[in-house]
């Protein structure tokens, strides 16, 4: 199996290959048959659906273990960890700092953290130093790059926030509204559990103090705390106000007392989980990177090739670094790979596809 090099990436981008793909199967860290807990969505629901089992060809029940959006966020954070490490790679990012404020802790948000990347409202509503004054980011030279960016001219965005060209961007809150810059995701990844069977989960709490419901009534105080004294309680129309949404003043409303054991649906056993990552080369080839004062021709073609290769390399690096961090998705949902991480270059028939290996160190080189 061949190492994946930058020259191979350039050849793939310059040719007609369809995509780079990495498919990895997993089992729960507790072993086959151990229960895993998927993410919950509104109403405490799991994302279940029927899919064709890629191994048996049968239609089976599946559950989503990590969504496309979540995987993109994890890849961005994997890149951020690499950038923060000593001797890490260099990558253009935006960063806004909330220093010199009354916040209890200092907060820093980068374009690898913000949900909408460089087009996020956090950056839109921030100030940037330009010359001898501070101006709103979108009114600055860097901010106006978004106004000028599209598929035919992504040069400025490549220098400002290249991950936006990889993970996708829609500048829907900018001055052009819904007509703002829009770039599709070039890389898509998700983890799905196949052969999913829902189980049960239990919940309870034993209070070592054995505080009973009838022990006392609990009242609100003016400073947001609680008290057992009516005299110290916050009052509404002359009456002491009890804690709790229903105003019952129970000890359980301030997290004391036992919680009776309960049983509900929760967790799944699965036959296996599969992580599928696809990096679309046609999506990258749609991007154009004109140079200032360029007359086109050979210079433009070379600029397009190099810029596209950078985006593909960035995607390979992000996905590889994420896999090497491990698949500990959330509490009670740790997965262990069943094999090595292999990238496949999907070529258009009759050309044959090729497989490659790359590790995190190589991906960052």
Locations of the language-model features?
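Basic polyanion-binding and macromolecular-assembly surfaces
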Residues: 1-38, 42-63, 83-86, 93, ...
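Extended catalytic/binding region for NAD+/ADP-ribose chemistry, centered on the ART fold
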Residues: 62-72
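Short active-site loop/helix that positions an aromatic residue
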Residues: 71-81
């Amino acid at each position: 199996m061949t190492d994946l090099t930058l020259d191979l990436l350039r050849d793939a981008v310059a040719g007609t290959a369809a995509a780079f793909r990495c498919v990895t199967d997993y089992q729960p860290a507790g072993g086959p048959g151990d229960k895993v807990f998927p993410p919950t969505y509104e109403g405490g629901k799991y994302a279940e659906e029927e899919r064709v089992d890629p191994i048996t060809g049968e239609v089976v029940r599946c559950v989503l273990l990590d969504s496309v959006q979540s995987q993109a966020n994890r890849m961005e954070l994997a890149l951020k960890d690499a950038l923060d490490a000593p001797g890490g790679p260099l990558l253009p990012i935006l960063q806004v700092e909330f220093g010199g404020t009354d916040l209890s802790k200092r907060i820093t948000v980068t374009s690898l953290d913000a949900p909408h990347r460089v087009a996020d409202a956090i950056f839109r509503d921030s100030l940037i130093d330009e010359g001898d004054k501070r101006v709103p980011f979108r009114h600055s030279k860097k901010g106006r790059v978004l106004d000028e960016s599209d598929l035919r001219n992504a040069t400025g965005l490549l220098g400002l926030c290249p991950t936006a060209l990889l993970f996708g961007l829609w500048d829907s809150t900018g001055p052009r509204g819904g007509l703002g810059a829009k770039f599709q995701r070039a890389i898509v990844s998700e983890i799905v559990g196949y052969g999913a069977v829902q189980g049960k989960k239990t919940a309870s709490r034993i209070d070592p103090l054995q505080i009973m419901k009838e022990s006392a009534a609990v009242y609100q105080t003016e400073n947001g705390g609680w008290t057992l004294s009516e005299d110290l309680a916050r009052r509404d129309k002359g009456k002491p106000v009890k804690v709790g949404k229903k105003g019952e003043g129970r000890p359980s409303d301030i997290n004391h007392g036992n919680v009776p054991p309960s049983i509900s649906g929760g967790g799944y056993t699965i036959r296996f989980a599969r992580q599928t990552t696809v990096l679309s080369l046609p999506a990258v080839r749609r991007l154009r990177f004109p140079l200032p004062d360029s007359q086109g021709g050979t210079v433009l073609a070379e600029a397009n090739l190099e810029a596209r290769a950078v985006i593909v390399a960035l995607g390979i690096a992000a996905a590889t670094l994420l896999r090497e961090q491990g698949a500990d998705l959330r509490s009670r949902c740790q997965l262990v790979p069943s094999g090595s991480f292999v990238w496949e270059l999907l070529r258009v028939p009759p050309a044959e596809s090729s497989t490659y290996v790359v590790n995190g160190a190589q991906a960052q080189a």
